[in-house]
């Protein structure tokens, strides 16, 4: 039995009507995962025993007709801590780490009676764009298993795209929800910075990180964001803004909406076939009654350089806690305290993590702070001002998520600069703290291409409204990959 073609609403309706029990759905989910995931490697750890116990309790108590997540299988990226369930951040450093508390978003999932079926693979400590830097295994794209799923939330994207779960959580520091969502043909939302609590998210870049949902449809995504959003006393950066019902505006009507298309997002560095998909999306929005006009974000070209200074500097600080003393990996046969630090970190961290720690430490060091970190902060302000200027006249900004579709496994792993440039279109959104979403827009040589929608701060509702209208008009989301799903 497969439930790939069912969205949250229909799955919930079947559970309420007792066409299927929560236990039957959970067992079918694990059976499907055991069949599909060995080909893809989306998961690092499964949570079968606990999920089946939760499902049995739900069957006994009855499914709440007003709670669309009750009994629904969900996956969680492995940098979000889960009490009693191994959380590794895909690093040897945390290979055997079992948290003693839940992240706030995990508590919200459990309070909604969702079933956490497993933890998904990712780039180590969320540093990467292909899920190839995981210390444990690579994850493969279900549309073409010779290609990457994107990253760093590649496991979550693949779990959803291949029909193993209808909803997964990811995190996005520079594009890590949107880029894999684009590469896998699913919907991924990076909410406004502060919309969702970061308590329990293993920190990479604390001024950039944000947790968000990954789903097959816009409506499911809106419902998932409603569940996890809101202020949290544990996270002082979480906003006290009221969380609206993100599903309320999903009418399909976007007449009169004004959308900006940055000329910098459609330039020479964009694959012509990706550009063609986005141009078709522009026409679709115009057919739906929206106005799309060219705008400019002139300082976005400096985004990648500024981001890798800021994010690496914050990572350098955040990862100091992994020292071989308090918890995590500790090297054997050490001779003294310095040896513990040096060898544990040298052996426990992978190459990409060490590269970013060194870059960040250099940027923060005496004599270089003003030239690099301070200057990057100034560029960040310029990028924020660019967005603010455009949003004086426009409701949304649209463009590609990534310059290309999914690339071949191994093609860019040895070339960090090329890998970093995959995030050139997503990074400015994180630097500005704005919400960004990927919606399936079409295909280039049989590989999914995502449309990026960028909204004003705390205006995810307008993004969902536009994304839903586009999704329903194009029906691209109904196409399924070669591995998993209906295949």
UniProtKB/Swiss-Prot annotation:
**InterPro entries per record:** Amidase, Amidase_CS, Amidase_dom, AS_sf, GatA
The alphabetized list of GO BP terms reads:
translation
Keyword ATP-binding on entry = yes
Tell me the active site.
77 (charge relay system), 152 (charge relay system), 176 (acyl-ester intermediate)
Specify the superkingdom: Bacteria
Q: Would you tell me the Gene Ontology cellular component terms?
A: glutamyl-tRNA(Gln) amidotransferase complex
Q: What is its EC number?
A: 6.3.5.7
This enzyme catalyses:
L-glutamyl-tRNA(Gln) + L-glutamine + ATP + H2O = L-glutaminyl-tRNA(Gln) + L-glutamate + ADP + phosphate + H(+)
Matches recorded under SUPFAM superfamilies: Amidase signature (AS) enzymes
Q: Which Pfam families match?
A: Amidase
Alphabetically list the UniProt keywords: ATP-binding, Ligase, Nucleotide-binding, Protein biosynthesis
Q: Name one GO molecular function term.
A: ATP binding
What is this enzyme's class at the first EC digit? ligase
**What is annotated about its quaternary structure and interactions?**
Heterotrimer of A, B and C subunits.
Q: Which family does it belong to?
A: Belongs to the amidase family. GatA subfamily.
HAMAP family the record matches:
GatA
Per its database record, what is this protein's job? Allows the formation of correctly charged Gln-tRNA(Gln) through the transamidation of misacylated Glu-tRNA(Gln) in organisms which lack glutaminyl-tRNA synthetase. The reaction takes place in the presence of glutamine and ATP through an activated gamma-phospho-Glu-tRNA(Gln).
- Supply the name of the protein: Glutamyl-tRNA(Gln) amidotransferase subunit A
**Species name for this entry?**
Lactiplantibacillus plantarum (strain ATCC BAA-793 / NCIMB 8826 / WCFS1) (Lactobacillus plantarum)
